[in-house]
Amino acid sequence: MPEFKVVVADPEKARSYQVEVKGEDAEKLIGKRIGDVIDGEIVGLPGYKLKITGGTDKDGFPMRPDIHGPVRVRLLLSGPPGFRPERKGERRRKTVRGNTISEDIVQVNTVIVEYGDKPVEELLGEGGEE
């Protein structure tokens, strides 16, 4: 059974919330891609819509929206995600993950695009990050 840590970012309050997703709800995330909009009920936010913005796999490699499938590849990168150059024109070969969620993904980053009736703090508790 897959298990994910879903980070829900609230752009209105500038806070983020981390939710553990297991079982059938985690199965619903497999096969989704970066940019897909999912139902918030998966993470305990009924009435909300969440957009997948990225994530990391079990070894900490970041997902990139321009690589298709759940594959891990080594690319020559000149900018984010996956590499932040320190000098202008710097490039480096880095390992990154594709844009599709698989069982190897551990963390899924999302942002709220449509709000429900109840506030997020009431449904998920107090946010940990600012």
Curated annotation (Swiss-Prot):
Keyword Hydrolase: no
GO molecular function: structural constituent of ribosome
Gene Ontology CC terms: ribonucleoprotein complex; ribosome
Domain of life: Archaea
Region ranges (Disordered): 78-98
Family: Belongs to the eukaryotic ribosomal protein eS6 family.
Record's protein name: Small ribosomal subunit protein eS6
Organism: Methanopyrus kandleri (strain AV19 / DSM 6324 / JCM 9639 / NBRC 100938)
